[in-house]
């Protein structure tokens, strides 16, 4: 698998992967992503700012992740929208993406990686914990159906 920066013309591929993962989450009863116009605009802006990465196998986009600086702490990178197209899940790709994010953090002089998971998505929380992230508890400012758990990993 190769991880590379997304280019503007790949926006539809990013949205497609996220939509398919969103459908999968909804089937599990997890309401988290919705592919709204706001998502379209946010992702388009993140691509322009070089924060969106594609996971590619044999020139086919099979996943995406957004890794960008935290607005409140420039020494922190935030991982979001980690999505792997369902047929490619459970193949050990997500830990590779987390390792990539950690390497990127080191290159950028960041000392913390952080992200959130929906409170109901136990498997993603477990994946983060298995890869050295520490559960920081829930965020209370979100509506009940969007309560999420914060995770952090110190970069050394």
Question: Which residues are covered by each model-predicted region?
Answer:
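Acetyl-CoA-dependent GNAT
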Residues: 8-11, 16-87, 98-100, 104, ...
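Short, surface-exposed alpha-helical segments at coil->helix boundaries
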Residues: 40, 122-125
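Active-site acidic-Proline motif in GNAT/NAT acetyltransferases
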Residues: 85-87, 91, 120
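Short glycine-rich hinge loops at helix-strand junctions in the catalytic core
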Residues: 92, 109, 132
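Residues forming the Rossmann-fold NAD(P)(H) cofactor-binding site
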Residues: 95
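Conserved GNAT acetyl-CoA-binding A-motif
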Residues: 98, 105-117
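Conserved catalytic-core motifs of GNAT/GCN5-like acyltransferases
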Residues: 116-118, 125, 129-149
